[in-house]
Amino acid sequence: MNIQSSIDKNSIKAVNNLNALLCISKVLNEDIVNITDIHLMKKGMTNRSFYFQCRGKKYIMRIPGEGTDKLINRKEEASVYRAIAGKDLSDRVLYINPVNGYKITEFYRDARMCDAHNKMDVKCCLERLREFHEMKLQVEHEFDLFAQIEFYESLWQGTPSGYSDYAETKSRVFSLQQYINEYKEEYCLTHIDAVPDNFLILSDGSVKLIDWEYAAMQDPHVDIAMFAIYSLYDKEQVDNLIDIYFDGYCPKEIRIKIYCYIAVCGLLWSNWCEYKEKLGVKFCEYAYRQYQYAKDFFDIVQRNLIN
């Protein structure tokens, strides 16, 4: 049989990857002609994903994006999915390839992403995040924030940052490491990419955390910082987020530590964005705001330490 001729040309155009279609066929044990209604989802910051149907059931397939092979260790990602298996935390993963990063999951009808500006959405998602943290799951790899900043910078291959004060900003951010280490109380599996888009609220009100590719051992409070900076929260919104997570009581030292994480994670994702932009992927306002978090929250930390 000529496989190429048996596939809907629109499907090939939507996926732009025949290997992905062959993978779906093998995983679902279905003839490739039964893979229908393929259409791209909104392109993510790290990956490209698409919906498809097979015999009336919907699925999602992820294909890693530009330069992702340098950013994500797919074997470590697979180990995370093994660690969370049976915990009812994630969407249902039917297939994950630890080499090329292909992933197939079931599609949840009537599910929606968390709205970072809806208080009830944020509350239920932060409660679920805290429940995950309290499980204190373990894996064998870690996500070292400061080492990753250096790593992303190394991917620039000697080209300078687009920010003229980068060296000064980096030095200031790295000076926060001592305070962080002093108040780092927990160390467990942390999502790392716990942004609103990665919380699915199902029709029954339950919450699933998806896209665990950055997950690793870390201080779980990093996830609070990540949620805040992706949402582009101002300081008042950050404080409200912290209060929701801690149910109204967060010790001052821990709050300041989270401010530190916001500065550190801002620089981390700014460097990540600079790498992706060198590959032709533009983030514009988001990238600029991440760099500003590094600067602004360093200043906020200093003011809080003085008072």
Segments from the language model and where they lie:
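Active-site activation/catalytic loop segments of kinase-like enzymes and analogous catalytic loops
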Residues: H221-C250, A263-V281, Y293
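Extended, well-ordered alpha-helical scaffold segments
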Residues: K123-C124, D165-L176, L241, F283-F297
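An alpha-helical support segment within catalytic cores of ATP-dependent transferases
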Residues: K13-I32, T36-D37, L137-I192, D197, ...
